Amino acid sequence: MGGRGRRALIAPVVAVILGAGVACDSQSGIPTEEPPSDTVSAPAPAAADPTTTVPPAPVPQVVVGEVPGNPAAVDAVRAWATDLVTRPGTVPAKCWTLPPAQAADQYADTSAILGALAQPGVDGQFAVSWTGGGTTVSVKRSEIASGYACPHVHPAGTVDFYTPADAEYAVTRFLSRESDAPVNGADTETAYPLICPGFSPWDPSGTGNGGRPPLRLDPDVLAGTTAFATDAMTATPVRGDYLEVSVPVTDVSGVTNTRQVTLSIGPDGYCLGEVN
């Protein structure tokens, strides 16, 4: 066949081959689309919860019965009672005017104290008292004036609720002041009187010839004290409200003598009237 004839035969064959190639490309040729990926997209992180502020628990309102004409007494004892309920651990350091062991014992029955305080208060000669359920809570005027009244708690009807421990602690506080180491920086004679005021004749021996307390006349008789032995203190009743505390006292010269301090009960509890 001539060249034109061969070209005529070849052209259809090429066309057939090309056609077959195109047809096969859609089945088994090189893929024209990427296969689906095996990678799984991580879920979007959940939105964080908005921060919430928990409001502080409300401070319990301690109910204190009114004292006609003396609202300061109510406020002062409420400040103490609120601490007793909400922050009892802070009370001992704040109530340094009482013997520590005595305060711990008297303040143990919180419910009895709150029950008494809820009753109307009575403004007496030297103290304000609340009584209820067989318990009396009494605060001295010096405690009220401080704005934070640490009371005496005692059975209702008790007349002489001050104890020898109160007398010994009064001597401890006085000697601590004299040795320039007060039990608290606020413990001064002006704010918390420890020397008997002399409202009544000083007469521990019952002679009938009493006068002003000697310590009132000479308050510096124990000035220069450098040390004293609290663990060696002894308290001895004398007569009526009078009580004598013996205590070894060391002066600036280093000499130690046992001193006898006579006390009585005054407006602020046990007060010192005489030193021998």
Give the predicted meaning of each segment.
Residues 25-47:
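Short, low-complexity, disordered segments immediately C-terminal to signal peptides
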Residues 1-15:
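N-terminal export and membrane-targeting signals
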Residues 20-23:
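C-terminal motif of bacterial Sec signal peptides marking the signal peptidase cleavage site
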Residues 109-115:
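A cross-kingdom feature marking solvent-exposed beta-strand/loop segments within repeated
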Residues 54-109, 157-209:
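Core segments of small alpha/beta cavity-forming domains
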Residues 211-276:
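Extracellularly exposed regions in secreted/surface proteins, prominently low-complexity, repeat-rich
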Residues 25-27, 118-166, 253-276:
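Short beta-strand edge/turn micro-motifs at domain boundaries
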